[in-house]
C-alpha cells in the first residue's frame, strides 16, 4: 500500500480476519486477509499487525504516540518516509546514486506477490483497476538500454 494508506491504517479497520483499507489516492476498497503471507520475506500480515499492536499507543498501526502535535497518535506520511530513510542509512548498505525509496517497497511487494500468487492477485492487492497500470508498475526497478 502507499505510505498515505499505511499511516491511515487502524486496528479498528480489522474485522472478519481482514484489514480493510480504503486507498486514499484512488478510493479503492480492499480487504486483505490477515493470513496473507510473503514467504520469501518471512512475513505474515497478522504477525505484522500483532507487532504493531505491541508498540502502538493508539488505534493506528503505525503510531507516533500521543503527543501535542499528534493528539490521536497518527504519523504524517513524510514522517514515515524520514524514518525509512534513517533505517536505510542505519543498515550501512552502500547504494548507487538512487537508493530505494519507501514507495519502492510497494513495487517490490507487487513483484513478489506476482511471483507467488499471480499477476491478477498483485493487481487487486495494489488496487489497480487497469491491467496496463499493473504491468507498468511491476516492471523491474533498473531499466536497461536497448542496444542498437
Language-model features, listed with the residues they occupy:
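Helix N-cap/coil-helix junction residues
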Residues: 1, 93-95, 128
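Key DNA-contacting residues within the recognition helix of helix-turn-helix
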Residues: 7, 111, 134-135
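C-terminal catalytic core of Y-nucleophile DNA break-rejoin enzymes
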Residues: 26-50, 56-86
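Short hydrophobic/aromatic-rich beta-strand segments that constitute the beta-sheet cores
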Residues: 19-21
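Short, basic (Lys/Arg/His-rich) helix/loop patches that form interaction surfaces
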Residues: 81-124
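Key DNA-contact positions within bacterial/archaeal DNA-binding proteins
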Residues: 4, 78, 132
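Catalytic-site neighborhood detector that most strongly recognizes the C-terminal catalytic loop/helix
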Residues: 23-27, 119, 126-148
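Short, charged phosphate-coordinating catalytic segments
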Residues: 1-17
Amino acid at each position: 500500500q502507499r505510505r498515505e494508506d499505511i499511516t491511515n491504517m487502524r486496528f479498528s479497520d480489522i474485522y472478519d480476519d481482514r484489514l480493510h483499507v480504503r486507498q486514499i489516492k484512488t478510493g479503492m476498497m480492499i480487504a486483505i486477509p490477515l493470513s496473507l503471507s510473503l514467504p520469501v520475506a518471512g512475513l505474515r500480515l497478522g504477525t505484522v499487525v500483532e507487532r504493531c499492536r505491541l508498540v502502538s499507543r493508539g488505534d493506528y498501526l503505525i503510531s507516533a504516540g500521543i503527543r501535542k502535535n499528534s493528539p490521536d497518535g497518527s504519523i504524517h506520511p513524510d514522517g514515515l518516509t524520514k524514518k525509512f530513510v534513517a533505517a536505510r542509512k542505519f543498515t550501512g548498505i552502500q547504494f548507487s546514486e538512487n537508493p530505494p525509496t519507501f514507495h519502492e517497497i510497494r513495487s517490490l511487494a507487487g513483484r513478489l506477490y506476482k511471483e507467488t500468487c499471480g499477476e491478477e492477485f498483485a493487481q487487486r492487492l495494489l488496487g489497480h483497476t487497469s491491467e496496463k497500470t499493473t504491468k507498468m508498475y511491476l516492471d523491474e526497478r533498473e531499466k536497461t538500454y536497448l542496444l542498437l
